[in-house]
């Protein structure tokens, strides 16, 4: 039905958090539409722009799994759940490698990948 509101879950998949496959099963079983993982491959040595949450970056920024690997693991254990990057930092990536990862994840997930992109906040 047009106009139906759909809800998703976003979290930092980190080495100390719930594993992506277990989280994906829980999210799908509870009827959510989507699961979103961010990308944080580069920790700035210095910052000209403040992080909006305070002075220090939270622990999860230092321990975040690669979103394509984590979403691939989530895709392997789900059937309907849409899987997205929230967001992929495309300006920090090789475009050919990124295109290959996006196409692979979308194909292996049966077309369930949602490609959220951005540039990040640090100047």
Task: Enumerate the predicted regions with their spans.
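Hydrophobic residues within beta-strands of alpha/beta enzymes
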Residues: 35, 83, 113-115
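Short secondary-structure transition/capping motifs
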Residues: 59-63, 87-94
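Generic, ordered loop/turn and secondary-structure boundary motif
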Residues: 42, 69, 88-90, 122
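N-terminal beta1-alpha1-beta2 module of alpha/beta enzyme domains
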Residues: 1-77
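Flexible, glycine-rich active-site loops centered on histidine and acidic residues
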Residues: 2, 6-18, 90-123
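Solvent-exposed polar/charged
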Residues: 76-79, 107
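Conserved catalytic cysteine-centered active-site region
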Residues: 78-86
């Amino acid at each position: 039905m047009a106009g139906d509101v759909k809800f998703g879950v976003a979290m930092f998949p980190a080495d100390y958090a719930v594993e992506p496959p277990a989280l994906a099963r829980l999210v799908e079983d509870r009827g959510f539409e989507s699961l979103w993982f961010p990308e944080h491959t580069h920790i700035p040595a210095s910052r000209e722009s403040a992080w909006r949450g305070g002075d220090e970056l939270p622990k999860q920024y230092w321990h975040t799994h690669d979103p394509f690997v984590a979403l691939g693991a989530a895709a392997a254990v789900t059937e309907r759940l849409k899987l997205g990057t929230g967001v992929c930092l495309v300006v920090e990536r090789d475009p050919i490698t990124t295109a290959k990862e996006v196409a692979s994840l979308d194909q292996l997930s049966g077309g369930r990948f949602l490609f959220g992109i951005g540039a990040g906040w640090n100047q």
